[in-house]
Regions:
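Feature detects amphipathic, helix-rich regulatory segments
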Residues: 1-163
C-alpha cells in the first residue's frame, strides 16, 4: 500500500518522481503522469501493477515508470496473467463488494493479499494466457482509436453541413 508524500512536495511540473495517487493517474490501463513529487515514500518499479485501493477500489494499470505510490494505490508484483486476473476481478465487481458498506469505498492490504486468484502453476501457461489477453487488449485499443477517428470525421462533416 502506498504512503503519501508531504503535500508541499507536489508539483504539476515534471520533477524527481512521478506520484500515483489513484484512478485519475491511470488511463487505458497505464500510469499517466500528472503530478510529481520530490519526496520518495513507497515505490513501484517499471512493469509493476498499480491498483487503486480507494474510491474507486480495484482499478488497475501497469507502469512504464518508476513511481512513488500515494495512499490511494498499491503496487503489485506480477506478470501479465496477474494483471489480467485483477482486471477481470474489477470488471466482475469483486473489489466493490469487499468495499461495500463502508462510508469511503476502500480495500486494505489483507483484502488484496487474500484475494482468491485461480493461477496456473505453470509459468509458461500463465505467460501464454497473459500474452493472448494482451494481444486482444491491443486490438481493442486499435479499434477504439479507429472508432474515435470516424466519430470525429462524422462530427466535422455534420458541422460543415449545417453551418
Amino acid at each position: 500500500m502506498g504512503q503519501s508524500p508531504n503535500g508541499s512536495t507536489y508539483s504539476e511540473i515534471p520533477s524527481k518522481y512521478i506520484l500515483v495517487q489513484g484512478n485519475a493517474d491511470l488511463k487505458d490501463g497505464w500510469v499517466f503522469p500528472r503530478i510529481w513529487t520530490t519526496q520518495k515514500t513507497r515505490v513501484a518499479n517499471v512493469g509493476d501493477i498499480i491498483m487503486t485501493v480507494r474510491a474507486p477500489a480495484g482499478s488497475v494499470g501497469k507502469t512504464s515508470y518508476n513511481v512513488v505510490l500515494g495512499r490511494g494505490v498499491s503496487g503489485v508484483k506480477g506478470n501479465e496473467f496477474i494483471y489480467q486476473s485483477l482486471v477481470k476481478m474489477d470488471i466482475d465487481g469483486y473489489w466493490k463488494k469487499l468495499a461495500a458498506g463502508s462510508t469511503f469505498e476502500s480495500i486494505n492490504c489483507d483484502d488484496v493479499n487474500e484475494a482468491n486468484l485461480m493461477v496456473p502453476k505453470d509459468i509458461d501457461e500463465q505467460d501464454r494466457i497473459g500474452e493472448l489477453l494482451s494481444i486482444l487488449d491491443n486490438l481493442i485499443t486499435l479499434h477504439q482509436r479507429k472508432l474515435e477517428k470516424l466519430q470525429n470525421i462524422k462530427k466535422s462533416m455534420l458541422n460543415k453541413m449545417f453551418i
